[in-house]
Amino acid sequence: MKKAMLALAATSVIALSACGTSSSDKIVTSKAGDITKEEFYDQMKTQAGKQVLNNMVMEKVLIKNYKVEDKDVDKKFDEMKKQYGDQFDTLLKQQGIKEETIKTGVRAQLAQEKAIEKTITDKELKENYKPEIKASHILVKDEATAKKVKEELGQGKSFEELAKQYSEDTGSKEKGGDLGYFTAGKMVKEFEDAAYKLKKDEVSEPVKSQFGYHIIKVTDIKEQKPFDEVKGDIKKDLVQKKAQDAAFMNDLMMKEIKKADVKVDDKDLKDLFEEKKADDKKEEKK
């Protein structure tokens, strides 16, 4: 969120600064020629107008529809500031952004999380109520290699050694394929579904995902905590997962925009949200 939030704030500042003078006012003078506010606005609108307007509308709609406490905004803002360290103030000065502009973006982000939370059902929470498991895998590019690895495992060869020999996952191969502990929603669906069907020390058949073919071994299954104790964590994970789902987010935001009765008067941008609806319909047909 951090760099994106600064970028969003920067574009908002540009848009707002363009509105602060009359259209004929010069914002740049030089021997090569002057630039008026109107010229600047038209150029900005051509290059990034739809994205900037989309972000500004989304921000207003979310903040209006979902109440976020000031203390929560301050907490998230402080976390963000801490991550940037000494660079934070420098970045704000370089881009001409005020802290309040960043805080507005943070408020919109937290409001968005509330909007996503509202869509999560008890059924979804219970479906994702699974024990924390530890697994290792051997990731290969093709099915033939996966079958070869599986055959060698059947001959008694070490899973860890075969991971070092064959695995394409540079992050885990030198650890014998160890991925550590994870819960529901942390892995791609095909991997997760297969892993949760295994007993401790059981090895899967080759599992195909977008990354290739996995041979999975579950090495530990933790005792499951009571549902009420982990419900909040499950919800947080689902919010993060849904926020990465472009189709879900488009659908969610179009519903929010429809409720807000958004109308765009600028002739060049008036079809912005109609275009989004059309794009959503195309995605649904795929």
From Swiss-Prot:
Q: Which InterPro entries match?
A: Foldase_PrsA (IPR023059), PPIase_dom_sf (IPR046357), PPIase_PpiC (IPR000297), PPIase_PpiC_CS (IPR023058), PrsA_foldase (IPR050245), Trigger_fac_C_sf (IPR037041), Trigger_fact/SurA_dom_sf (IPR027304)
Give the PpiC domain ranges.
130-220
User: Which reactions appear under catalytic activity for this entry?
Assistant: [protein]-peptidylproline (omega=180) = [protein]-peptidylproline (omega=0)
Claim: Disulfide bond is one of the keywords in the record = no
Q: At which residues does the record annotate a lipid attachment of kind S-diacylglycerol cysteine?
A: C19
A single Gene Ontology CC term: plasma membrane
Q: Which UniProt keywords apply?
A: Cell membrane, Isomerase, Lipoprotein, Membrane, Palmitate, Rotamase, Signal
Give compartment(s).
Cell membrane
| Top-level taxonomic group | Bacteria
Q: Provide the leader sequence positions.
A: 1-18
The Gene Ontology biological process annotation of the record reads:
protein folding; protein transport
Per its UniProt record, what SUPFAM superfamilies does this chain match?
Answer: FKBP-like, Triger factor/SurA peptide-binding domain-like
GO MF terms here are: peptidyl-prolyl cis-trans isomerase activity
Q: Does the keyword Cell membrane apply?
A: yes
Its Enzyme Commission number? 5.2.1.8
Instruction: Name the residues where the record annotates lipidation as N-palmitoyl cysteine.
Output: C19
Q: What class of enzyme is it?
A: isomerase
Q: How does it sit in the membrane?
A: Lipid-anchor
Function according to Swiss-Prot or TrEMBL: Plays a major role in protein secretion by helping the post-translocational extracellular folding of several secreted proteins.
Family statement: Belongs to the PrsA family.
This one is known as Foldase protein PrsA 1
